[in-house]
Regions:
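An accessory alpha-helical subdomain
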Residues: 2-3, 148-200, 322-365
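N-terminal pre-Walker A segment at the start of P-loop NTPase domains
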Residues: 3-49, 188-231
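Conserved nucleotide-sensing/catalytic segment adjacent to the nucleotide-binding pocket
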Residues: 12-40, 77-148, 260-335
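N-terminal accessory targeting/assembly segments
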Residues: 23-82, 234
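Glycine-rich phosphate-binding P-loop
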Residues: 57-76, 224-260
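A cross-family "folded-core" feature that marks the main globular domain of proteins
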Residues: 60-61, 71, 79, 87-92, ...
Length: 374
């Protein structure tokens, strides 16, 4: 692949531009709850859906082609029509599908309870209620298609293994680049900016009690490419766009996070999908202020280039260029593997469609909506 093709593949793209137009507002929010990362598949389901504000979770079973995502989209649609704050939790591998819905005012969530993002119930039958979309399957008809389904499933798994190998290798190069650059980061200047930015976005009176920390992921390394949402910016009254330079944004967010914890602020954190140790966004609900790396509309830019000794970095420019080019090529291969995995998944679902009675699926969906909204 030439450099232009590689850059096109790995560049972050807005979900609205790549897949479909959506509203990202204070009432309608879109996130991910898992990531394809250098560590393999990482799930934040327990952190997000284990939140004490959620009093009931409907766990959807079944499998490919059983209509789970369609069910959740129907729940989200009714929730929005009723004026509830609705978090759409998209699948990190197939962003056009949903893995979950959270209805804030009702304290209710509906989530995909199947692998790989399984959720461990806290009180099954009390807090967590099982729903089985698989009841709509004709299992005898599916059994006749088993050889095709097995072959496609194995091919899909192979592509995921390949993607994680490339992501792990790209992660090693990213770590190496950060270590080379760190001596040329103006840490004191960066820290002062991060601290003052957080303090300006926080209430005048700080709490001595720990603030509540929530997790919502803004971006995904997916079969559809490098896709991000702008729901931090959509929920905010004031948005700061953080422009990275040679990894300085990671350090900036680390310092901002430390200060926010010291101040006892409630905050919502987003982590990079490639590396779960890297923060790429912080939202403060009390002041409705967002610091994020993904926003088309924003109030102020914090350019991290100002926190680097650019003359010093010239000394390692060639090494950084080599690492960046190699890392980009590895990421491009990871995206290709994920795209292939996505195609195999679609073919698996196509095997299930003729073996599913969607009138039963519709009935299950109606009963679920009745339980939630009655």
């Amino acid at each position: 692949m030439d450099n232009h093709t590689v850059k096109e593949i790995i560049s972050p793209k807005s979900y609205c531009d790549m897949i479909e137009k959506i509203d990202e507002t204070k009432k309608e929010r879109h996130f991910f709850a898992a990531a394809n990362s250098k560590n393999g598949f990482v799930s934040y389901f327990d952190d997000i859906f284990g939140d004490e504000s959620i009093s009931r979770i409907y766990l959807l079973g079944g499998g490919p082609g059983s209509g789970k995502s369609t069910m959740m989209k129907r729940v989200a649609e009714i929730s929005k029509k009723n004026g509830y704050t609705t978090d759409h939790i998209h699948c990190s591998s197939s962003p056009y599908s949903l893995d979950g819905v959270i209805i804030a005012e009702k304290g209710i969530a509906v989530i995909d309870g199947t692998a790989p993002h399984t959720y461990i119930p806290y009180a099954a039958g009390v807090r967590e209620i099982n729903i089985d979309p698989g009841a709509a399957w004709n299992t005898n008809a599916l059994f006749k298609r088993r050889n095709t389904i097995y072959a496609l499933t194995d091919a899909k798994k192979k592509q995921y293994r390949k993607a994680y190998i490339y992501l792990r290798a790209a992660g090693l190069l990213d770590t190496e680049s950060r270590e080379m650059t760190d001596p040329y980061i103006l840490h004191e200047k960066l820290q002062k900016n991060a601290v003052s930015s957080v303090l300006s976005a926080s209430p005048k009176k700080h709490s001595s009690n720990p603030g509540k920390i929530s997790i919502r992921i803004q971006r995904a390394v997916s079969s559809a490419g490098n896709i991000y949402f702008e729901s931090f910016a959509g929920a905010a009254d004031k948005t700061f766009l953080i422009n990275d330079f040679r990894g300085a944004a990671k350090i900036w967010f680390d310092e901002a996070y430390i200060q926010a914890k010291k101040s006892g602020l409630d905050m919502t954190i987003s982590y990079s999908p490639e590396d779960p140790a890297i923060i790429d966004g912080i939202y403060f609900p009390a002041s409705k202020t967002a610091f994020t790396m993904y926003a088309e509309k924003f109030d102020k830019i914090i350019n991290c280039e100002r926190f680097a000794d650019k003359r010093g970095i010239i000394n390692i420019k060639q090494k950084l260029a080599f690492a960046s080019k190699t890392r980009s090529s590895l990421l491009a291969e990871a995206y290709k593997a994920l795209a292939d995995a996505g195609r195999y998944h679609n073919e698996i679902e196509a095997e299930y469609y003729p073996c599913t009675d969607y009138s039963i699926t519709d009935k299950i969906t109606s009963e679920l909506c009745e339980k939630i909204f009655s």
